[in-house]
């Protein structure tokens, strides 16, 4: 516990209003003196409880819920009533509850957002209010916001356009910043940009709470986002802004436009890439191989897949390959087949990842012929197969067996969310590779039994990366998020892998260790920020102290009353 946490907190609120403030409410844990000082007598049951007793009651209530969506709603109700208790409950049951507060359950919560809505959290900034964004940001009661997660809800997980229902993603993401990375909830703000929706189910739903209008696009959309960004810079000039679940047509252009203007990153592109590279580095370390020796095939060539590919290329270059050599080891497959330079429908960010058709002459096929996944596996002979397609079953038995036929221990990463859209299940992959494959998934899966072996499955979850990045940026007071900082995060994650440190277990650490992993990543990110001149240089001791000082624990502080 930090020295700050030991000191009393001076609070200007009292009575029912204090009980209605999630950041300050202690519920039945207010002491006798606090109940007197803050006019709470008679507003709470007589018995004074510890946070341990409150947590035990909350967990017993949680276990009465019948479905995962019910559990999600229950946890969110606690969060909206008492944030300290909410995060204490998560701290004690993180592995069990992470799939409830975030993927996969949060996807259903987004779909049902208007039906399960209870109370306000975060900011809803709609296109008709575009001239009042500064006023909207001023209405936020948190003056010291350090991390904002923003979405326009156009590409929520693998579920597509969810309108304002996408707010569930920033709320869930920021919950993980706190639960995994120790960022105080007082420093976080979820935001949804309501630019309409093209989802007919929402437009025709009488309960839909968002702006009932088709999505704004083009110049109008870009101007609206820019109004928001400029207002954010005026309100919180040192904030870390995370873009979340923007469609690929907007995700990369927005990142490119603003990455040098304020401290921001896109978790779908850069966070996903960092955790994927960290996983790949861990697998290479465990096998005694170099990353630069691997050949990687992707299924799914959207912004997320291409972002991972670009970071793998950068990592290969750090091991001595030149850029052209590294790019020849990356094969991107989408619904049209292998991306090649003779295709006319490539997106801007796909061009650099397209293979030269002239180099594939031995593969057969004529100019313009599509090269399907199985043909790519047979000819490219990859050692790594990564799925970011959102299409269930694309990693067929034939594909996986072909992969295994030329690589004894391939790394297979079906990363699509939610579980219903995964390219293949771990059980299938391990059955088809005689238990030899290393597997990391995007959604959580239970350990797999293969013969007499019980094999743990690593969840290649961005939660291993983004909380540590946030903590490192805040502790170092970094003014940008760079590719070097993301690579430092990936390397730090790889060094925490059980198969690297112990020679056994999953490719990634257990979620129960994620808070310590986040601290290690924060140190690496902060040091890299200093090395690149994006943060003031300090000694290791000062940096470590800053990380510990910014690491929040869900514990109640004593309150003292003060006037406004």
Curated annotation (Swiss-Prot):
UniProt site positions, description: Important for activity: 268
Residue numbers annotated as active site: 102 (proton donor), 173 (proton acceptor)
Enzyme Commission number(s) from the entry: 1.1.1.38
Cofactor (UniProt): Mg(2+); Mn(2+)
GO biological process: malate metabolic process
Pfam families given in the database record: malic, Malic_M
Domain of life: Bacteria
Family annotation (Gene3D superfamilies): Malic enzyme, N-terminal domain, NAD(P)-binding Rossmann-like Domain
Keywords: Metal-binding, NAD, Oxidoreductase
A GO MF label: oxaloacetate decarboxylase activity
Name under which the protein is recorded: NAD-dependent malic enzyme
Organism: Pseudomonas aeruginosa (strain UCBPP-PA14)
Name of the gene: maeA
């Amino acid at each position: 516990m930090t020295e700050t946490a030991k000191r009393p907190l001076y609070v200007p609120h009292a009575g029912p209003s204090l009980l209605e403030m999630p950041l300050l409410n202690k519920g039945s844990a207010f002491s006798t003196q606090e109940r007197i000082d803050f006019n709470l007598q008679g507003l709470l049951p007589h018995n004074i409880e510890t946070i341990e007793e409150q947590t035990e009651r909350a967990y017993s209530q949680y276990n009465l819920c019948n479905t995962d969506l019910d559990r999600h709603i229950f946890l969110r109700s606690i969060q909206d009533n008492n944030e300290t208790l909410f995060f204490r409950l998560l701290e004690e049951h993180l592995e069990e509850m992470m799939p409830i507060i975030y993927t996969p359950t949060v996807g259903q919560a987004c779909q049902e957002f208007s039906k399960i809505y209870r109370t306000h959290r975060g900011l809803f900034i709609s296109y008709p209010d575009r001239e009042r964004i500064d006023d909207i940001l001023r209405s936020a009661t948190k003056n010291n916001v350090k991390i904002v997660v923003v979405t326009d809800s156009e590409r929520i997980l693998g579920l597509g356009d969810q309108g304002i229902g996408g707010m569930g993603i920033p709320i869930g993401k920021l919950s993980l910043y706190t639960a995994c990375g120790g960022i105080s909830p007082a420093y976080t703000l979820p935001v949804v940009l309501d630019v309409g929706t093209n989802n007919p189910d929402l437009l025709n739903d009488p309960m839909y709470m968002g702006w009932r209008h088709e999505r704004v696009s083009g110049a109008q959309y870009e101007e609206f986002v820019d109004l928001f960004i400029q207002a954010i810079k005026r309100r919180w000039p040192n904030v870390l802004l995370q873009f979340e679940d923007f469609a690929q047509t907007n995700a990369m252009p927005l990142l490119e436009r603003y990455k040098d203007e304020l401290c921001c990153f896109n978790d779908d592109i850069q966070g996903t890439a960092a955790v994927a590279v960290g996983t790949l580095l861990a697998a290479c370390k465990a096998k005694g191989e170099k990353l630069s020796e691997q050949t990687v095939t992707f299924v799914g060539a959207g912004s997320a897949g291409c972002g991972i590919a670009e970071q793998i290329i950068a990592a290969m270059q750090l091991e001595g390959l030149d850029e052209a050599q590294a790019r020849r080891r990356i094969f991107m497959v989408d619904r049209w087949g292998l991306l090649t330079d003779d295709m006319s429908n490539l997106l801007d960010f796909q061009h650099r990842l397209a293979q030269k058709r002239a180099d594939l002459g031995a593969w057969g096929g004529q100019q313009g012929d599509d090269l399907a996944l199985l043909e790519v596996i047979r000819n490219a002979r990859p050692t790594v197969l990564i799925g970011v397609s959102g299409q269930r079953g694309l990693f067929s038995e034939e594909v996986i067996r072909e992969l295994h036929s030329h690589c004894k221990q391939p790394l297979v990463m079906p990363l699509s969310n939610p579980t219903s859209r995964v390219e293949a299940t771990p059980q299938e992959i391990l059955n088809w590779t005689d238990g030899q494959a290393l597997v990391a998934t995007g959604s959580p899966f239970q350990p797999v039994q293969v013969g007499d072996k019980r094999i743990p499955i690593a969840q290649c979850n961005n939660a291993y990366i983004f909380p540590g990045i946030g903590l490192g940026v805040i502790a170092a007071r970094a003014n940008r998020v760079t590719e070097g900082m993301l690579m430092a995060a990936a390397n730090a994650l790889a060094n925490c892998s059980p198969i690297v440190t112990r020679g056994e277990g999953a490719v990634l650490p257990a979620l129960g260790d994620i808070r310590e992993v986040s601290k290690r990543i924060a140190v690496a990110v902060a040091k890299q920020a200093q090395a690149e001149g994006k943060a003031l240089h300090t000694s290791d001791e000062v940096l470590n102290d800053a990380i510990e000082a910014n690491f929040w624990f869900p514990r109640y502080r004593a309150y003292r009353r003060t006037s406004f």
